[in-house]
Amino acid sequence: MVDIIVTENGNVRGVFTRVISASLTDSLNGECTFQFSVISSAAKEIFTGLEVELKSDTLNYLFNVVKVSKSLSNGIAICTVECEHKSYELNNDEYKLAEFDFEGAPSECLISLLQGTSLTGGICDPTVPIKLKINRECTRRAALMQLIALCGGEIEYN
């Protein structure tokens, strides 16, 4: 069973175990989004800015709610919630990099890229030293994707 846990500042606002539909996209190119639909009356406490945890025995993802839309289907009010993985926060202006110059282990580069954010790095399989130089403004998420490409690796979210 998969639980969809909606929180605000760490406080649980709702737990959904039964939904009309749900879709998780977790692709090798770095895209990680989640969308689910529930009956509107059950979702009246959901709005943009909340966090959604997708949790089961094999899954553990953390998302931000970015869009909530309502519709009617056969006379039933439906609420659709669209979410982006927490790593999308790295696209925010506050995390932009003017430049970045790193030489060393990929795991240390990951730590450096995530420093000062709400995210932490997990297991980093590549160990061959790398050089990553960025000399124009970019988001930390773009820099993270460059690191992944440079290592020939994949990103796995949780």
Give the label of every model feature segment:
Residues 82-158:
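Charged- and aromatic-enriched interaction segments used to assemble
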Residues 1-99, 145-152, 156-157:
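Assembly/oligomerization scaffold segments
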